[in-house]
Regions:
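A glycine-rich helix N-cap at a beta->alpha junction
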Residues: 68-80, 163-184
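C-terminal helix-cap and adjacent tail motif
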Residues: 2-14, 169-206
């Protein structure tokens, strides 16, 4: 079960069965995983917005339009030959993983950080903390039977206008639509490409 969770939680869910809901106890546990995971010196590097209001979710979703022609003919078996091409033009699509039943938005927290040195830069520590939190959410949500999808592709200033704070990461959590391929866009006629598994991470045992 745990091994299956590890591999299943890697996948980004692009469509949702919005007729279903997340159980309240499950919701609390998922939020706890995002707010009580490890961080450097237990400092609060981020704030968490738990968004369930459908109108707000859809407003944020509209600000994630940025996936499109640069990947439209991507061949996962020819990864190196299909490099990102910024010159391609065409229709851009939103990132529909953000349309889940619950949208988590991680935003910057500047309060409570200890200034140890004049040149302290918290960006690396913050990125690490958010990454750990997202990983916790991925695993816990998957163990509870839900799916997830992270999104960094957004108009940050527009999302900030909605949230009132600078966004770092958006993360959809919810009930997958089991009648569809997980890569199908929720509302548009588009199939997101998938990248061939290339994570043969060198591991050294001492």
């Amino acid at each position: 079960m745990i091994k299956e969770t590890i591999h299943e939680s890697q996948k980004c869910q692009r469509n949702w069965d919005l007729g279903q809901s997340i159980a309240e106890e499950d919701k609390k546990l998922i939020i706890e995983s995002a707010t009580n995971c490890p961080s450097k010196q237990n400092l609060n590097y981020y704030k968490l917005h738990v968004i369930e209001d459908r109108e707000t979710i859809e407003k944020i979703h509209e600000k994630t339009r940025g996936f499109g022609p640069i990947y439209s003919d991507y061949n996962p078996d020819l990864r190196e030959e299909n490099a990102y091409d910024p010159e391609k033009t065409g229709e851009m699509y939103t990132n529909s993983q953000t349309l889940a039943q619950m949208l988590l938005a991680f935003t910057k927290n500047e309060e409570g950080l200890i200034q140890r040195e004049e040149d302290d830069d918290w960006e690396e520590d913050r990125a690490m903390a958010v990454g750990i939190a997202a990983g916790y959410v991925n695993v816990i949500a998957t163990q509870l039977g839900y799916s997830t999808g992270c999104c960094k592709c957004m108009d940050g200033s527009e999302v900030q206008d909605i949230l009132g704070e600078q966004p770092i990461l958006l993360m959809g959590v919810g009930v997958a639509d089991k009648t569809r391929n997980r890569r199908e866009h929720q509302t548009e006629d588009f199939m997101f490409p998938t990248l061939k598994k290339m994570k043969n991470i060198e591991t050294t045992y001492v």
